C-alpha cells in the first residue's frame, strides 16, 4: 500500500482493478472502478459487505453518472431538484439504467449517486474519466476512518493506494434521499 499525493498513481491503480482509499466530505472512502466486477468483489470482500446492498457511485459531474441512471423514470421536476442540489455531500437514489452492473446496484433497480464537492474527489474522478464507488473506509463493525493514518492502520495491507488529503470536516456519512419520493432515507 502506498500513500500518494500524485493522483495519477491512484488512477493507474484504479485502471488495474485495485481498490484505493481517498478523502471525501466526511470520511475516507474506498473506491474502485464500478464497471470492473473483479475490483468490486475485492472491495466488497474487504468491507465484508454483501453484494445485495449495492454501493454509492461518486463523481465530479452528473455527466459522469448519466450512463448509470434511467432518466426516463424521473419527472423533469425530480431531475431538476436532484441536479440543483449538487455538488454536495448529498446522495440520491435514482432509477438504474439497464447498463448499471448488478454488483453496483445490488438487489435493487436503483443506483445511489452523488456529485461531490470535495476537491480530491473532483480531481480523481476527472482524471479517471468516470465515477468511483464510494463506501466508507472501515472494516465491518469498526468506525469509519477519518484520517489517512486510520486508513493505513485499519486497511493498509488490503488496499493498493491511499490518496493523501483530508476530509472536508463533515461529521458522518452523506445524507441519502430518494429521487422519486424525495424522502430522506439516511440522515446526513
Curated annotation (Swiss-Prot):
Required for the formation of a threonylcarbamoyl group on adenosine at position 37 (t(6)A37) in tRNAs that read codons beginning with adenine. Catalyzes the conversion of L-threonine, HCO(3)(-)/CO(2) and ATP to give threonylcarbamoyl-AMP (TC-AMP) as the acyladenylate intermediate, with the release of diphosphate. The gene is tsaC. One of its GO terms (biological process) is tRNA threonylcarbamoyladenosine modification. This is Threonylcarbamoyl-AMP synthase. It catalyses: L-threonine + hydrogencarbonate + ATP = L-threonylcarbamoyladenylate + diphosphate + H2O. GO terms for molecular function: ATP binding; double-stranded RNA binding; L-threonylcarbamoyladenylate synthase; nucleotidyltransferase activity; tRNA binding. It comes from the Bacteria. InterPro entries: DHBP_synth_RibB-like_a/b_dom, Sua5-like_dom, TC-AMP_synthase, TC-AMP_synthase_SUA5. PROSITE patterns: YRDC (PS51163). It comes from Vibrio cholerae serotype O1 (strain ATCC 39315 / El Tor Inaba N16961). HAMAP family: TsaC.
